[in-house]
């Protein structure tokens, strides 16, 4: 297998891009005119790590960028990190935005690999340090989320039948899935509590009125950065921070965008019962916003954002939630 060929007039920026598919990895170095291909399996991962390590020894620090590909990228990302390489996993929207910036319309695996390499070279943010314990727990949580999606699908399917016989079958399926979900949650909590520090974080978050065990799991596992950031950063990471839309005389209503979808979905689901029953401070916030003319959805988003801020605060302080009717 031949190595990378550098383009004349270009230098390596210390960045590589990996286009990940189910069976193949297409890899490009920033400033290289060629790409290399590896199988997306243990043997291919080992060969890629050797190549990347060699490139790092030759050129100094090397960052490897990958695009999230429905989970196909997880194994190679973990392998590269284990080999001591700095890895950045981009969301597809980030890579597409960079392609628009470059005016790149064509799309092939080699083009995507080069694009990811350039995106990696231009990236100026901090590289997220991944806790291997969290990665394993996240896969367990993903399974629970998929079971929950199956329950929703079966409930929708139930509404489309009038035959009692078929309704009975579907109701049995729903019951079975709910039992599986409950068992999976119990197993996840048990696995998480094997790590005392994570168990403590779970207790602190679950102790907030309105945040149940299921939502607390999502926050602890999907947002391990909680407790080490500002309240504004926490809200933005969850995709619950409102962004201004203003230019010249145009001044539109602020809206939320981006962030971690799964976290936002979990915390938004918790916001409704919190705003109507469980958390006096959130109930007060919801009623105050509605009195000011905000829509139900706007008020709920604000309540969800406040719950994330509460979680960030208790983890920062390391002290349990104190019940209050006042907005904190």
Language-model features: locations:
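Basic, amphipathic alpha-helical segments enriched in Lys/Arg and hydrophobic/aromatic residues
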Residues: 291-328
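Long, charge-rich intrinsically disordered scaffolds of nucleic-acid metabolism proteins
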Residues: 81, 88-207
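Gly/Thr-rich phosphate-binding beta-strand-loop-beta motif of the actin/hexokinase/Hsp70
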Residues: 4-30, 116, 218
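Phosphate-backbone recognition surface of nucleic-acid-processing proteins
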Residues: 213, 218-292, 296, 323, ...
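Short glycine-rich phosphate-binding loop at a beta-alpha junction
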Residues: 60-72
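Nucleic-acid-processing active sites and adjacent nucleic-acid-binding tracks
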Residues: 32-63
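Intrinsically disordered, low-complexity and often Lys/Arg-enriched segments
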Residues: 1-12, 35, 323-328
């Amino acid at each position: 297998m031949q190595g990378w060929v550098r383009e004349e007039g270009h230098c390596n920026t210390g960045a590589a891009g990996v286009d990940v598919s189910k069976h193949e990895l297409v890899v490009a170095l920033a400033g290289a005119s060629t790409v290399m291909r590896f199988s997306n399996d243990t043997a291919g991962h080992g060969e890629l790590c050797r190549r990347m390590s060699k490139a790092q020894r030759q050129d100094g620090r090397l960052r490897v960028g990958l695009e999230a590909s429905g989970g196909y990228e997880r194994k190679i990302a973990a392998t590269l990190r284990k080999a001591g390489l700095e890895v950045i996993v981009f969301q597809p929207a980030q890579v597409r935005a960079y392609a628009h910036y470059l005016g790149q319309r064509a799309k092939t695996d080699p083009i995507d690999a080069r694009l990811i390499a350039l995106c990696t070279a231009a990236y100026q943010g901090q590289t997220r340090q991944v806790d291997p314990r969290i990665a394993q727990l996240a896969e367990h949580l993903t399974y629970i989320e998929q079971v929950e999606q199956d329950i929703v699908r079966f409930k929708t399917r139930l509404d489309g039948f009038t035959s009692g016989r078929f309704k009975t079958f579907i109701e049995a399926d729903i019951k079975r899935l709910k039992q599986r979900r409950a068992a999976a949650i119990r197993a996840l909590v048990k696995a998480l509590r094997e790590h005392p520090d994570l168990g403590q974080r779970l207790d602190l978050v679950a102790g907030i009125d309105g945040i149940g065990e299921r939502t607390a799991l999502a926050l602890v596992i999907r947002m391990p950065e909680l407790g080490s950031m500002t309240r504004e950063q926490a809200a933005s990471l969850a995709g619950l921070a409102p962004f201004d839309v203003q230019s010249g005389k145009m001044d539109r209503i602020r809206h939320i965008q981006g962030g971690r979808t799964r976290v936002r979905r979990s915390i938004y689901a918790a916001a409704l019962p919190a705003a109507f029953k469980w958390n006096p401070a959130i109930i007060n916030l919801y009623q105050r916003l509605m009195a000011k003319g905000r829509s139900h959805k706007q008020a709920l988003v604000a309540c969800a954002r406040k719950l994330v801020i509460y979680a960030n605060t208790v983890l920062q302080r390391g002290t349990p939630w104190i019940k209050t009717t006042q907005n904190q």
